[in-house]
Regions:
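Acidic (Asp/Glu-rich) sequence patches and key acidic residues
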Residues: 1-217, 224, 238
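C-terminal or internal capping secondary-structure element at the end of a domain, subdomain, or sheet
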Residues: 228-238
Length: 238
């Protein structure tokens, strides 16, 4: 399961943070809808049965409806026999907390670190220490430079080709890593923006192109935000 950051912008005269996030709750039940047709589910069952004799035997004498019920756990069907779901297709979280793992992520112009503040009070100056650390990370992971005395190889989940494809250069990587950004953004009108879906264990399903576009354009959310809006960092779990 995954934790990730969301910057929620609220207007004092608009919806609250809780109201903005509610439509994206995994626990929100929606009007029954066809997620997959009965043919799609049965095709999936048949593919698995081709390579599993025990499974094939278990399903051999079941009706199509019984197969679908057993396979999906669904007990709602439309008039054509398609399984119905009440799972929220816009689900983004099963629980969340303000700050959380990213407590005090926002730096104000007064030098304080907080979970929320007015947009006009944000200090968006790139972090010099993070910039230098990112440069060194690239040198060790992408350029395969030797470790210096006292250094340890940094933890890394990706191949060097991933960094080259997404960031192109060491300097661009360091610039992006040292500037403020979050995985997703929710605006006061309720729109949710993200580069891709968040999967298990913090792995984004977004491709390099969507990630690159997000990195390059994230600042537009801040530039276009009303200075008197409140920005809050939320730790979402899915």
């Amino acid at each position: 399961m995954s934790h990730y950051t969301v910057a929620v912008f609220t207007d004092s005269e608009g919806l609250s943070l809780e109201e903005l996030l509610e439509p994206y709750s995994e626990g929100l039940k929606v009007k029954p809808y066809v997620d997959r047709t009965k043919e799609e589910v049965l095709d999936e069952i048949n593919r698995y049965c081709e390579n599993d004799e025990e499974l094939k035997a278990n399903y051999e004498n079941l009706s199509d409806k019984e197969k679908i019920e057993d396979w999906t756990g669904c007990d709602l069907f439309d008039k054509d026999g398609n399984p119905l779901s009440t799972y929220n297709p816009n689900s983004k979280w099963d629980w969340y907390v303000v700050g959380g793992r990213w407590s005090n992520m926002l730096k104000t112009k007064d030098g304080e670190y907080v979970d929320e503040c007015l947009v006009k009070d944000l200090d968006l100056t790139p972090n010099e220490d993070e910039y230098n650390a990112a440069i060194r990370f690239w040198e060790l992971v992408v350029e395969d430079q030797p470790l210096k005395d006292g250094e340890e190889k940094p933890f890394n989940m990706y191949k060097k080709e991933y960094y080259i494809e997404r960031y192109s250069t060491k300097e661009n990587y360091a610039r992006i890593e040292s500037q403020f950004s979050t995985y997703a953004v929710v605006m006061p009108d309720g729109e949710w923006y993200e580069p891709g879906e968040m999967g298990w264990f913090g792995v984004s399903l977004a491709g390099p192109d969507s990630n690159r576009e997000w990195d390059e354009n994230y600042h537009k959310f801040l530039e276009e935000a009303d200075p008197n809006w409140i920005i809050t960092i939320v730790d979402c779990h899915i």
